[in-house]
Amino acid sequence: MSDAKELKQVLTGPIVNNNPIALQILGVCSALAVTSKLETALVMALALTAVTAFSNLFISLIRNHIPSSVRIIVQMTIIASLVIVVDQLLQAYAYQISKQLSVFVGLIITNCIVMGRAEAYAMKTPPMMSFMDGIGNGLGYGVILLAVGFVRELFGNGSLFGVQILHKISEGGWYQPNGMLLLPPSAFFLIGILIWIIRTYKPEQVEAKG
């Protein structure tokens, strides 16, 4: 029973209580770049979740056989291999989205969330817990990406997943899109607003002064 409870905590904790973007402020760069559309935000979230979960799993499986002096190299080799697999799958089955994501899938290799969970958690924890931790942190990352992508695409282009929701004035409708929301800096402000909302709702996440 305690194992099931711990698994649930590991899986759900990063979504709100210890969100990698909102609380740990990790993985922000990719969040700025890929959230102008919900479609790209969703695919990026799934890609990072898969890489984080399986890199955690594989690193945890061999953690007792990795010399401390080369552990970072081993971790990056495993992560890079998984990123290549994910990138090739996207190019094979979702080529247009792969083109839109451009270099950002490849940059998952250096994402602080992936590296951080591998070093801080997978190196010290059994495989199943590490795998669930990877999924949980991927979901936490994805929740923020989808929230930001929802606002940016809806109010920046009047659409969701490419389907027109708010009909533009230029097409005979009533809505004038806010083009500023499609620029990467807008995501920075939206993430800041999300962090403010979360920390207002959960004041224990506010850092102590001094």
Curated annotation (Swiss-Prot):
The answer to keyword Translocase applying to this record is yes
Q: Which keywords accompany this UniProt record?
A: Cell inner membrane, Cell membrane, Ion transport, Membrane, NAD, Sodium, Sodium transport, Translocase, Transmembrane, Transmembrane helix, Transport, Ubiquinone
* Any single GO BP term: sodium ion transport
Q: What domain of life does the UniProt record list for this protein's source? A: Bacteria
| GO MF, one example | oxidoreductase activity, acting on NAD(P)H, quinone or similar compound as acceptor
Kindly report, in one word, the top-level EC class recorded for this enzyme.
translocase
Enzyme Commission number(s): 7.2.1.1
* Transmembrane parts of this sequence: 14-34, 42-62, 72-92, 103-123, 131-151, 178-198
Catalytic activity, per the record?
Answer: a ubiquinone + n Na(+)(in) + NADH + H(+) = a ubiquinol + n Na(+)(out) + NAD(+)
How is the protein disposed in the membrane?
Multi-pass membrane protein
The record's InterPro entries line, in alphabetical order, gives: NqrD, NqrDE/RnfAE
Instruction: Give the subcellular location.
Output: Cell inner membrane
- GO CC annotation: plasma membrane
Name the family the entry cites: Belongs to the NqrDE/RnfAE family.
Functionally, this protein is described as follows: NQR complex catalyzes the reduction of ubiquinone-1 to ubiquinol by two successive reactions, coupled with the transport of Na(+) ions from the cytoplasm to the periplasm. NqrA to NqrE are probably involved in the second step, the conversion of ubisemiquinone to ubiquinol.
Protein name, entry field: Na(+)-translocating NADH-quinone reductase subunit D
The organism named in the record is Shewanella sp. (strain W3-18-1)
